[in-house]
């Protein structure tokens, strides 16, 4: 008899080791037709979020809300509800369509659970001006979190937020009609966020936080106090128009106070601000070793691409803006330019702006403001402008190997000089030794001013801004090491020999 008991215990231990804790995982169903005294099975579901919050969940468990139905309250999960790397805790919908979590004046879900997946749900708040105090999705101080395929709207404090999250993913998030921001990530009281991936998201019409009278609000996607992050294939538009203050303002997609941030293959258009900014993309104060590449910006009230050092920020250094396109940005704010470099404090230096294509019939190609910034180099760009090439009050960066041409029917001037030749002779810009390396010539660009694309997944199909077969920009740029290896459309770019000028390598 003793031998049988020992074998029975051994078989249980072996089963647990082989199958892991997920062997004990359960699916918990929540339905508007349920009852919280039920066991939470599909046939006998729970009814409320309160029951969910009163339950401790195990790795591999699923919390399933009935699709097409609305559930009032805030889902609250903590570290005791965490999954494991192999058996994640999942919060999602079941049946037809998505379930809606109505956070009312509070939040939709607040979680500190690691190894968590939240997907296929709608989160709605009372409205940024109708009593909402919360956030749609707030994940904090945990790791290995996935947010996918959600719609979040009506939250004053923001749509979807990572705070102190390590190894987090947000994909296919539609954030709209929120206050402070559509999507954001940053530090908690305990730690920075790190190793983040934000992709295939849309931030639309997040106008501003009516209660924030001291700082920017109405951002599309913003991350700060983050190390190692990629934002790609996202669209941000019509954000920031109702920020309730003047001063520093929102941006479509941007990052600040971090390291190794890449923003690529994104579109930012028609973003606004009643104060400053309101631009497309921004690498902001305290950022190092970060890149804006392969993006499209157009019709933003602020600059399409902004490099900015705010007061008291940490060092801003070794940042790159390359192979992007800007069309008619800077329509209202800052120095009314496509690209803007601004230093309100020391510590900003050593940044590269190369192989971008700029078309601006409404303002300048590039502007410089605030303090002088050492080590700013502008190479291999195409500037098609309807007036002044350069505006602003501070010392200029170094221009080399760029092509300049006026918008049809306009006259282009150069930092107060009437002609390109006068500018070069007076300033030494566009010269390496005694050789003039810049050109005042029609760059041969296809359909300038005609970009209207809104789907980042289709950027490779953009017809406008390619080079014509006879373009003088083909193979005439200055070699740049570690140039990313590709152009805006995915064509290979040489590393050691002459690339083309602008965002397009080949017709």
Placement of each model-derived feature along the sequence:
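Parallel beta-helix/beta-solenoid
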Residues: 58, 66, 79-81, 86, ...
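Surface beta-loop-beta hairpin patches that serve as ligand-binding interfaces in beta-rich domains
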Residues: 417-439, 444, 450-454, 460-507
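Acidic Gly/Asp/Thr-rich repetitive segments characteristic of extracellular carbohydrate-active
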Residues: 32-66, 70-72, 76, 106, ...
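Extracellular beta-strand/beta-solenoid scaffold signature
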Residues: 76-79, 102-109, 129-138, 154-163, ...
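Cleavable N-terminal signal peptides
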Residues: 12-13, 23
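Right-handed parallel beta-helix/beta-spiral solenoid domain characteristic of secreted/periplasmic
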Residues: 32, 46, 64-73, 82-135, ...
